[in-house]
Amino acid sequence: MNAPFTYASPTLSVEALKHSIAYKLMFTIGKDPVIANKHEWLNATLFAVRDRLVERWLRSTRAQLSQEVRQVYYLSMEFLIGRTLSNALLSLGIYEDVKNALDEMGLDLEELIDEENDPGLGNGGLGRLAACFLDSLATLGLPGRGYGIRYDYGMFKQNIVEGRQKESPDYWLEYGNPWEFKRHNTRYKVRFGGRIQQEGRKSRWVETEEILAVAYDQIIPGYDTDATNTLRLWNAQASSAINLGKFNQGDYFAAVEDKNHSENVSRVLYPDDSTYSGRELRLRQEYFLVSATVQDILHRHFQLHQTYSNLADKIAIHLNDTHPVLSIPELMRLLIDEHKFEWDEAFEVTCQVFSYTNHTLMSEALETWPVEMLGKILPRHLQIIFEINDYFLKTLQEQHPNDIELLSRTSIIDESSGRRVRMAWLAVVVSHKVNGVSELHSNLMVQSLFADFAAIFPMRFLNVTNGVTPRRWLALANPSLSEVLDEHIGRTWRTDLSQLSELEQHIDFPAVNQAVRHAKLENKKRLATVIAQQLNVVVNPKALFDVQIKRIHEYKRQLMNVLHVITRYNRIKADPTAQWVPRVNIFAGKAASAYYMAKHIIHLINDVAQVINNDPDIGDKLKVVFIPNYSVSLAQVIIPAADLSEQISLAGTEASGTSNMKFALNGALTIGTLDGANVEMLEHVGEENIFIFGNTADEVEELRRQGYKPREYYEKDEELHQVLTQIATGLFNPQDPGRYRDLVDSLINFGDHYQVLADYRSYVDCQDKVDALYQHPEEWTTKAMRNIANMGYFSSDRTIQEYAEHIWNIKPVRL
């Protein structure tokens, strides 16, 4: 790299890596190798590997700046990036070299990798999708960066105590984060509260409280390329230090009160919003992210171009869900108040810059903020939102002069339930593109949630089906299957997943079938070891591993899975000597800390597991395990081991899902409803290679319209009746027999909102087909191979190419 001085680039030989790791341990960490612990060796290794990426990173950044390319800025409240060391080694192609270097130093790479804390910067699919997208942006050499919050405590650590979820703080920074660079000089003031002072036609936002946002950068390496990108995370810092006067008077709590209040903004991911103060903190958190980010984007732009007149040509800002939608009024505010744009001019630029991904159609999950709260915390932004709404409704009224209902339905301000700002509405009105994340979801989005907007802005809406990065989810997570693929179709599938289709030519070869089966068994043994170590439950790796791992939520219907587990238990109890296909039902996932019903479902799973796993009649025929503290790194162990992937959400509720893709990519067969991306997976793998059951989205709606009566299903279906009665009468919790009465009531007497009982029989019958097929291992593996071969479409590389072409209008950087 050109520099005004000479320097030696770090080299990649085993010998150089050994020197580098030892040097970092002694001179960066300041530790004697004789007494260094695993964490210190891990950090030394991370520093040594980071050094080998920095040059690429600086070169990429310099190329983006010198070529003056249009850049995308991807805003997300969550980034679940997973462990960084193993991914970096894979990207650089030095996995074996580092392993050998550490071996020669008497250290084990796998042990060090397991020491790394997962950065807990997300909750579920939203954050993992954002991380896959950053990986693909870098691998494709596209100019972009992610922006998020550097939470001190990530999604809580989940412990299971007496069957119940217990949350404890997840201090992922406990041993530092060598992967990041703190940018002491990149800091912005973020303001809250205050009032608006009118000066003629101009508004001034005055008397505000201020906190500082300080930048921390992480390198996002592209795979097998010099291209890298940046994830910039903001940490909150008090604008004034402690109150020394109060401290010296001995009032220590008061001395640090303001500082703590300021820094709470980046303390925890998604503070519990069941209280007013919790909701207010969440709003502050969202604004903290967007204010620092938009200021940074404008600062970077001006440094490069010395003008804001070409802003719309050079930047694209993408909103991952509604959490960062406040960046719309923030950009307007900065352009008008700080950079002297006229309102119309600022609005035109804003409309050209923003695009938005919708991730849910469920009304309870769509963000709205009370006008009163927004007015108190962000008065200037509320004023701008009112102005945007006024402008939009006036334009609409000219086109539809007598349609008051339409104006009411499309107004950004919802007047019907206590005056609330609808964030999704704001995003749709201003963004130049709005996308859904699967064909079904995008169709439902324009037919239901945004039907009025789709009629007003027909060219605004499009579909971009989600994808996953094959680097982390196949190459890294499943080395044994990757080896089989490399041997038969070559190695370049890592950057062109469509090449998996070449596996079709090998499907009828017994040796390949055997190799794929052997790889699966190796992965199942690895997971069985984890289960034995963590839960003290011994499972048979040759049993069918039936897996549902995702956030615990009623719409994802873990409850229906449990009903099938109990049905299976009852059948085995009735005839213990029959030839049952042995199964291990594996659950993992966190319930939001304030979500009573989801936590109740976790408790039920563990109660059921306790009874089944200790029943001598059952033995190895059925085991149930709930693996606590689900994370990216745990998923990388569970997914390759799955035989059956449970994707059983009520049709029309899951926008896309990405675990469905990860499982199929790793050779699991899917049992699922026609929901989210399952629909497109069915089209790609063929209906004979996937287990589909249950009502379609149209049938779900039709059932609602007719008046769904869950009690009828309960009364007509003997097995269902037995299962629900057992749960209600305390068979699985005799010490507290009434524990799940409310849960059973919600299904039978209170509407069964997610239609578990309506799909139960279809689901159980479909599970019988799964058993029948599993008794023919070659045929099962043939279908698994067809799934793998047809997963090429579901790469996040394809997804990002579609975003780049149809939404962001960005092109790769020349390196």
Regions found by a protein language model. Give the residues of each.
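A conserved ligand/cofactor-binding region detector
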Residues: M1-L815
